[in-house]
């Protein structure tokens, strides 16, 4: 059950000049399900990517990194769902390369100018016969307004498509930003998102785009977690087609800050949508750590709380057993933490002060907050002035059911 997940209507999704998308049913995931997506990018488009830090990197991730490292143009992307092409060794690597070659022939572009992406079951061979047979239909479907279909086409256990679209004024010009993401489980990206594609018709110089992709991932997709698992296939792609008549060459350009902020807002929304649609989620939780000595320790504490199964199940049950939060803070890895300076709020309710229970705290007040669909947990460490935030969800019975039945 998605938690307050707002999806724009198809008519509200804005095409990005220079991007065409086609979707097809290849039978990789399930019969009658769109599971193959192709992006075609106009000449002159700039592309940058950020990928999983999992050492068990999927074959398509390796191919993407190799193609981007060549420094040439990227003219197309191809995404399949239902199979991750991970844990497949040399044959899987060849399949990812062959996918690029097959699409390249259809689009008349070199294979090294294509980026492949896969998501789904790990340790299973990619069904190349079905994938390559589906490519012509995806290419035939290419159109500027293909974002809505693509958002559906990249889904796995997602219950709803995740789309963001907006227009902003940059340097007196109208700039369009549209993106999609997918993911509902195995989400602690530590780099980007499960799969995320964000495009703008502004022009951004390639070196700046690479740095911007890293920054956007860090403030958005690197701040979410569902279950603490980092996927083998996580990929975030940032595309700038340069069709809007606005070009940013350096971070010092007057237009850069406004464009960066608009892209960051889009990326953050796409990241939060993943948590709102997390497998079995009934609560959307914001874990904010304040008064930390640095960002690293703020995130250590936030993730310790966000990853704790005991904390997550307590929120599912609306059970104010909040000592579980204190325990998670204690094992977060800050060796010199002075717990006597710690304060904890649940929404507007002060639960703990000076490392112990607030004398005025009433459990009924805590439970009132925990029954809400969206919950803010604030933790003040009393160590400094740095703050950071992580977004997560509860663990429900449905999470276990979804993952137990995933391959059945």
From Swiss-Prot:
GO cellular component entries: cytoplasm
Site features described as Involved in the stabilization of negative charge on the oxyanion by the formation of the oxyanion hole, chain residue numbers: 119-120
Keyword Transferase appears in the UniProt entry: yes
Keywords of this entry: Acyltransferase, Amino-acid biosynthesis, Arginine biosynthesis, Autocatalytic cleavage, Cytoplasm, Multifunctional enzyme, Transferase
CDD domains: OAT
GO BP of this protein: L-arginine biosynthetic process; ornithine biosynthetic process
InterPro entries, per the entry: Arg_biosynth_ArgJ (IPR002813), ArgJ-like_dom_sf (IPR016117), ArgJ_beta_C (IPR042195)
Catalysed reaction, written as an equation: N(2)-acetyl-L-ornithine + L-glutamate = N-acetyl-L-glutamate + L-ornithine; L-glutamate + acetyl-CoA = N-acetyl-L-glutamate + CoA + H(+)
Gene Ontology MF: a single term: glutamate N-acetyltransferase activity
Site (Cleavage): 192-193
Active-site residue numbers: 193
Cross-referenced Pfam families: ArgJ
Amino-acid positions noted as binding substrate in the UniProt annotation, renumbered to this chain: 156, 182, 193, 279, 403, 408
Family in the record: Belongs to the ArgJ family.
Protein known as: Arginine biosynthesis bifunctional protein ArgJ
